[in-house]
Amino acid sequence: MSAFKPTIKRRESTKIYVGNVPVGGDAPIAVQSMTNTRTTDVEATVTQIKALERVGADIIRVSVPTMEAAEAFKLIKQQTKVPLVADIHFDYRIALKVAEYGVDCLRINPGNIGREDRIRAVVDCAKDKNIPIRIGVNAGSLERDLQEKYGEPTPEALLESALRHVEILDRLNFDQFKVSVKASDVFLAVESYRLLAKAIKQPLHLGITEAGGARAGAVKSAVGLGMLLAEGIGDTLRVSLAADPVEEIKVGFDILKSLRIRSRGINFIACPTCSRQEFDVIGTVNELEQRLEDIITPMDVSIIGCVVNGPGEALVSDLGVTGGNKKSGYYLNGERQKERFDNDDIVNQLEARIRSKVAMQENRIEVSPVE
């Protein structure tokens, strides 16, 4: 609800489609994750994909390292709705097989799947079936000659690797692709993406690879991806965590939400607490986050434990609670309400008000006349 609107001029890029999800151009920045199950375990993989769908994943990548995994992918695709990207290396025949089974995007590096005729076979198949490709360059797997030329992964090395692959697709007259240049070092990744953003017009897939565990990886990704997104660079992203992939989607949306680029669900504004708090702020926020995971309507909710900053935050929130003695003040659309919440029942009362406001907003959207 804040009146202050940041200005982020988004980089101009071409638009492609991964299934029914637009990527690039003026499309919303898509949030992705990747399954970490054995792809041959169809039941486990489908279960994880559906869990990712529930928290808002736009696109999901699945590793397909073998022909056995390709056959499993066929069954997985039949049981899921979200667009699926097949992650493939070395064996071009796997790409051809998953294309038969309805894959929505191929993640390959044209340079590591063999001779020109094999690359052409994959590209021709992608053209015929209208399947986009992601070129995925990674600092940890640079070509040997580039390692020797630059001595170590550098932004220039990652750019040169990416442009090699781009040139292959250009030569084959294929333009339905996106590119990533990932590194585990934040500054290396950021500078590589900056160089790439100037060099090509295709959509960019952002990521800080092998970022780390849930906490450190989230921080690393927020810093790196936040720098790029604030500069208008990026059309889709994945937060890479050594954690439940569901957390990758949550963190991805939190990053976009923090930059006011794309909102999904409740944006909680909560104080870190001190001895002035009149109710259990931390417990309240944690409980509400769990209870309200199903809500996708964007909404700012402030939960502040005392009257020092509470009223000011509540004025720029959709709903707000400001701690008071035994009862706390309640704000709706930035206005103080006569109603006050019992401090020992804030969670239930606030959940009810949030759900009521969401229902009103969704109902208003449904009954709005079509112009």
Swiss-Prot record:
Can you quote the record's cofactor note? Binds 1 [4Fe-4S] cluster.
By sequence similarity, the record places it as follows: Belongs to the IspG family.
- Reaction(s) catalyzed by this protein? (2E)-4-hydroxy-3-methylbut-2-enyl diphosphate + oxidized [flavodoxin] + H2O + 2 H(+) = 2-C-methyl-D-erythritol 2,4-cyclic diphosphate + reduced [flavodoxin]
Instruction: State the protein's name.
Output: 4-hydroxy-3-methylbut-2-en-1-yl diphosphate synthase (flavodoxin)
Q: Name one Pfam family in it.
A: GcpE
The record's GO molecular-function terms, alphabetically, read: 4 iron, 4 sulfur cluster binding; 4-hydroxy-3-methylbut-2-en-1-yl diphosphate synthase activity (ferredoxin); 4-hydroxy-3-methylbut-2-enyl-diphosphate synthase activity (flavodoxin); iron ion binding
Supply the alphabetized keyword list: 4Fe-4S, Iron, Iron-sulfur, Isoprene biosynthesis, Metal-binding, Oxidoreductase
> Which source organism does the UniProt entry give?
Actinobacillus succinogenes (strain ATCC 55618 / DSM 22257 / CCUG 43843 / 130Z)
One of the GO BP terms on file: terpenoid biosynthetic process
Record's function text: Converts 2C-methyl-D-erythritol 2,4-cyclodiphosphate (ME-2,4cPP) into 1-hydroxy-2-methyl-2-(E)-butenyl 4-diphosphate.
Cofactor(s) required, per the database record: [4Fe-4S] cluster
**Functional pathway:** Isoprenoid biosynthesis; isopentenyl diphosphate biosynthesis via DXP pathway; isopentenyl diphosphate from 1-deoxy-D-xylulose 5-phosphate: step 5/6
Q: What is its EC number?
A: 1.17.7.3
Source species taxonomy: Bacteria, Pseudomonadati, Pseudomonadota, Gammaproteobacteria, Pasteurellales
Residues where [4Fe-4S] cluster binds: C271, C274, C306, E313
Tell me the domain of life: Bacteria
